[in-house]
């Protein structure tokens, strides 16, 4: 499902340049001349040229020279005693660059408002020119803006969702899951080969090819068949016995964007192979879990599943409506937002793998990027759609809506509501919470108006297959 919440800014950008903050505009003295011009109207990338002229520019330049005069050490003079004209000659380029950046910081927000431009992500300072004599600063910034699009008739959609019903088989499946969770690992005979589902205790040595030739030697545990290792590593380990070694030469490494960043040689020695042993399903097992009997355990499971199915219905409806909204709108995605979203999703996937005890240095990052890119694009499109709907319908979150959003964040990050509020306030992120709460409210409003049609699971699968066939045929004809 496309996600409503914005990905945090991890500092990624689509182009090189100086990242400019967007603080409140600073006042200018003596009616200084300010001028801004925007360009690039046919693209999401925009360039804005801003000219600032007045006494405030001259004052900032003079002030910086005087500060430097007091602090810099110039050969032939004691600290703070060099003539101002020498300081000006030596540090002219530095002062002009720093003053230009400072004035860009102070004036950019006002310039953007005058040009009626709203960046959706990072703003890059591409060029700064300072004329000390005229007291003039001219700078150029580039950034991306939100795409313009027409909102479709989202309130009269028909959305199909799979029919979700309680089945007694779910209780049996949960009991099996509990058995799996309470299983024990017992050593296999040394002559038995490793197979899928086995836990391997291995000692591995990784040697970087080229560079500094760094070597890493560690011991870890992995379960074959759970995607904890790259496919080629898993295949090499299958069928091996305790004491045997495998070697993989020139294995490529990838960064978070899927680009190859180097190669390594890996040597793995199997120290132990363990098999999973499941407990018997009886009253004794139920008592170990805190229930009087197996019957009591089954009843509790049944009750919990029914509650979860109700929540699942709501979640599936949200997902299908969100997917439908994205499907019916053709919206270009700003590349700066896409890079940020990709970085966030890849990082989150890596943290999930780390939580499972997986060494993410050898995970196929390129594959993860390919998997999450459609999700990243859908997330961004959905936010634009819900923002536009909320704006057109005048939807605003209440205090209760915002409080609920903070509560959800606190649960997500395993902390208190007060701590979350403190963090968002200190980092000037309160507007992000407000916008996420507004999007959530907009989606609920849309869901209340669309027609929800429940279909049997079999029909659902058949329609998915039909869509996939149509997609493949269209790709084959292009």
Swiss-Prot record:
Gene3D superfamilies, per the entry: 3.10.50.40, Trigger factor ribosome-binding domain (3.30.70.1050), Trigger factor, C-terminal domain (1.10.3120.10)
Main location: cytoplasm
Location in or out of the cell: Cytoplasm
Entry GO MF terms: peptidyl-prolyl cis-trans isomerase activity; protein folding chaperone; ribosome binding
Catalysis performed (reactions): [protein]-peptidylproline (omega=180) = [protein]-peptidylproline (omega=0)
Family matches, as Pfam families: Trigger_C, Trigger_N
Function statement: Involved in protein export. Acts as a chaperone by maintaining the newly synthesized protein in an open conformation. Functions as a peptidyl-prolyl cis-trans isomerase.
Protein name from the UniProt record: Trigger factor
